[in-house]
Amino acid sequence: MKQQTFSDFEYSNRKRKTKREGFLEIMDEIIPWDEWVGIIMPFYPSGKHGRPPKGIELMLRMYLLQIWFNLSDEGTEDAIYDSYAMRKFVGINFLEEDAPDATTLLKFRRLLEQHGLNKLFFDAINRVMVETGHMLKGGTVVDATIINAPPSTKNAEKQCDPEMHQTKKGNEWRFGMKCHIGVDAFSGLVHTIEVTPANVHDIQVTSKLIREDDEVVYGDSGYLGIGETGRDRIRHAPVRHRLSHQPPPEQLAEGIRQFG
């Protein structure tokens, strides 16, 4: 049982609980933490050399916050400091320790990716979200963002990492990778992530972001031409494309009511 803090006692007297806090409490109850920690444990640093690593469950909870709320590494760290609900979910008592920094989260995420655990957990999370009614399906918002990296970045073989590439966005040249995401239009939660070199065009990956039962896809002008080019053959049933549009206001309102 997590130790109660002064903030916990203070917040326990509130008249209402936020939807976000309620959602995180449900996730806290239904996720098999011991089982998931056991999956990661064989791959996690032992701490025999150097500074002792942060606890596996702590890092896993932080990683899940990043996925659910589509946060950057720095944004996740900041959110734990800013949000009582997120701090409570992670289980940090600021009288005893600080939140893990963005670099620590980055290393943890790379460890999961290295051993293929990120997809295992991501798929498991999506199943939990659908089963509990927090992800309704039917509509997806597609988007992409460039993850910058120094041009000198090398891989484990001391060679230029082939997964990183140079691309031009507007009048600016960027180097790194591109993160393509599919977001549930009803809840605002990320359901699919694909990572490519930065020079891969958005529409080349779109088919991987669309779920089998999606009926409508929303995207900005970068996705013009989707469904009309052989490079991106939509694998699923007929899908309506709403480019440069946001989901209907009633859907956005529902997402805000559930997770705002």
Which role fits each region the language model picked out?
Residues 2, 65, 74, 78-81, ...:
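Polybasic low-complexity intrinsically disordered regions
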Residues 50-51, 243-251:
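Arg/Lys-rich, glycine/proline-spaced intrinsically disordered segments
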Residues 37-58:
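An N-terminal domain-cap segment
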Residues 1-34:
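Charged, often Cys/His-bearing segments associated with DNA-binding zinc-finger transcription factors
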Residues 36-37, 142, 146, 257-260:
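Short amphipathic alpha-helical "interface-anchor" segments enriched in bulky aromatics
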Residues 32, 51-56, 97-100:
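Secondary-structure capping and boundary motifs in well-ordered enzyme cores
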Residues 227-230, 251-260:
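Short, intrinsically disordered, charge-balanced linker/junction segments flanking boundaries
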